[in-house]
């Protein structure tokens, strides 16, 4: 009996995955005019610790940003934006401020730029996330663009360089999110596990999502 139930669950997860991808693709076409669903492997995993480009589902992003109160003065950056699913979601939700994405893989960044160029409030940067100044932004987001060692280096960069407080959204945080839990200036506002919504599985496995604030020493 248990084997039958396991088979049914497995088939339902597969059907859920196909349905969610179909829904996401339809949303992409409406907002971007192209699909953002295809995974792109990173050529920089071994050298720079950069993970591949995958698109977080719109339903997952609804939960990630649930309750967010964005303002016209907000400046948002998605670190490791890939083809721009987070950017597309923010457009759908009528984000009132400035939206930026930075992507290390030039080909992926160009794909994102191609559809995003028609929106005046979006800027897509093709480049290394370790080489820009984050004082231009007050909201940072990432969907696990780095392996744990590089995530730690990125956090240390923020702590060294930021001169004003930020809000930080971290999706797929289970590998390295704990690194910032007890560091000075960091405060967790919320954490949740995302796996199912509307009766459908959102991902292959449950994913952690946390929301933080960071206040630099000069602002405490």
Please give the residue ranges for each predicted region.
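Conserved SAM-binding strand-loop segment of SAM-dependent methyltransferases
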Residues: 119-128
